[in-house]
Amino acid sequence: MVKVYAPASSANMSVGFDVLGAAVTPVDGALLGDVVTVESAETFSLNNLGRFADKLPSEPRENIVYQCWERFCQELGKQIPVAMTLEKNMPIGSGLGSSACSVVAALMAMNEHCGKPLNDTRLLALMGELEGRISGSIHYDNVAPCFLGGMQLMIEENDIISQQVPGFDEWLWVLAYPGIKVSTAEARAILPAQYRRQDCIAHGRHLAGFIHACYSRQPELAAKLMKDVIAEPYRERLLPGFRQARQAVAEIGAVASGISGSGPTLFALCDKPDTAQRVADWLGKNYLQNQEGFVHICRLDTAGARVLEN
């Protein structure tokens, strides 16, 4: 039996639309991510468990984990009879890389079960392909950090899909999921087809400056450059209370904040534990909309997807 855990991730990080993402893990030790188990069997089966299992498609062939198994078998050129279990702990359409968690855990578990026939680059390419079936286009800003850990910059040149960017140990990521769903496809459809020249220049300056600040170890500058001129101005209308929440967390002391992925999760970066706690308390009282919402104080998950049992 192989059991794989794949962590939540926060894509875009305001400054890097479709090209930056970070894997995150709660500071209290809770596992924020999906788990997939693979066991040898006579025929294929898929069992869904976990807090959000009831939100998955009722038709098994529509389940992305089934599609991962099917695509993996196609890649190897043979049917691999296994019993798979998906522990769906991540809310769907949350902006926390929920589909990436399932895809990464499923493909990594299959690869481990079969003795690692695929290398990490090929596996990551498959992960992007499968996750793209849900989001509507192939992009790696959730699957790459989820699989490899840390903060990842998408390269997609010279057979390199992504590479790690050094993060800051003192940064605490407060993630607030309000409990409503925003589909990635809907959030992409709301964006303009073309952008003004000054927005393109500002975006390039922010992203280049952010990467420079990470490598030159300037956390205050990096946080200051986490600005979004590409998606947030258009997407915030999908997120009730988002603008007020951003203003409130800044007043409490967050050094940066924005939309996690395509939303509705809000991320707020803090450089002190007491500030992070106050931000989390405010968001818990004011940004959550129902019982399914939650707030976690996280750090970068530098390990990425990992085998829990083998």
Curated annotation (Swiss-Prot):
GO MF annotation: an example: homoserine kinase activity
Gene Ontology biological process: threonine biosynthetic process
Superkingdom of the organism of origin: Bacteria
Intracellular or extracellular location(s): Cytoplasm
GO cellular component: cytoplasm
Catalytic activity: L-homoserine + ATP = O-phospho-L-homoserine + ADP + H(+)
Name under which the protein is recorded: Homoserine kinase
Organism of derivation: Escherichia coli O157:H7
Name of the gene: thrB
